[in-house]
């Protein structure tokens, strides 16, 4: 697990990539098929970022502490250098986090999903990295194809062109900003709440 409490400041040494997606096996009710989202994360996303040493990769289930998760998730959606949202199965949390990211950051957001004829209307004009339905096993050749495409999307995102529909259609909106010091204070507050809850439960 990724422990934010041990970080003096999260965003100082390496670029951060936050992954918004479901984890484990989930049902895709659009086609009544079960999808193992951990396969695409481990074999494609994590595998690719193992070679992108300038980035630190974080997925929500790798964050320890319930209060820390809440604060750090919103902080990451604002401050992360890159967010990858895999919306396969139309996972509610991933869709919600993608919407927050689009509201907070004009650029550096990548959407990916398994191929489907049913793309949400509000996203059908966004650039989306799609990959084939791989069933229960993602073979190495197909994994390499997806990794190559994802790497291209990452390189393009570093140009910081606007990819948020909100900032595309309402260009006068100014994105919010938070300093590293303020972020550390929020994380410290969350840590204190976590310890207080633990003490109360333990009594």
Q: What annotation goes with each model-predicted range?
A:
Residues 2-63, 75-80:
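Conserved N-terminal substructure of TIR/SEFIR domains
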Residues 28-29, 120, 164-165:
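Serine-centered coil/turn micro-motif
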Residues 55-59, 87, 98:
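Short N-terminal amphipathic alpha-helices
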Residues 62-66, 88-90:
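Short, acidic/glycine-rich phosphate-metal binding loop used to engage nucleotide
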Residues 68-72:
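Short acidic active-site motifs
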Residues 74, 89-154:
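Cross-kingdom TIR/SEFIR domain
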Residues 127-203:
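C-terminal interaction surface of TIR/SEFIR-family domains
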């Amino acid at each position: 697990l990724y422990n934010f409490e041990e970080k003096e400041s999260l965003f100082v040494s390496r670029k951060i990539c936050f992954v918004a997606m479901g984890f484990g096996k989930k049902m895709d009710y659009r086609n009544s098929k079960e999808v193992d989202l951990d396969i695409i994360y481990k074999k494609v996303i994590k595998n690719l970022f193992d070679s992108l040493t300038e980035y630190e990769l974080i997925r929500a289930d790798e964050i320890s502490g319930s209060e820390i998760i809440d604060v750090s998730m919103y902080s990451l959606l604002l401050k992360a250098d890159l967010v990858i949202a895999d919306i396969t199965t139309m996972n509610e949390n991933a869709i919600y986090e993608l919407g927050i990211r689009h509201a907070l950051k004009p650029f550096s957001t990548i959407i990916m999903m398994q191929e489907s004829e049913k793309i949400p209307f509000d996203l059908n004009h966004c650039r989306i990295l799609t990959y084939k339905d791989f069933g229960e096993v993602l073979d190495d050749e197909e994994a390499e194809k997806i990794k190559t495409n994802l790497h291209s999307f990452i390189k393009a995102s570093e140009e910081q062109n606007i990819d948020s529909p909100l900032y595309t259609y309402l260009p006068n909106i100014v994105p919010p900003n938070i300093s590293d010091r303020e972020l550390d204070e929020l994380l410290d507050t969350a840590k204190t709440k976590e310890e207080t809850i633990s003490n109360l439960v333990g009594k």
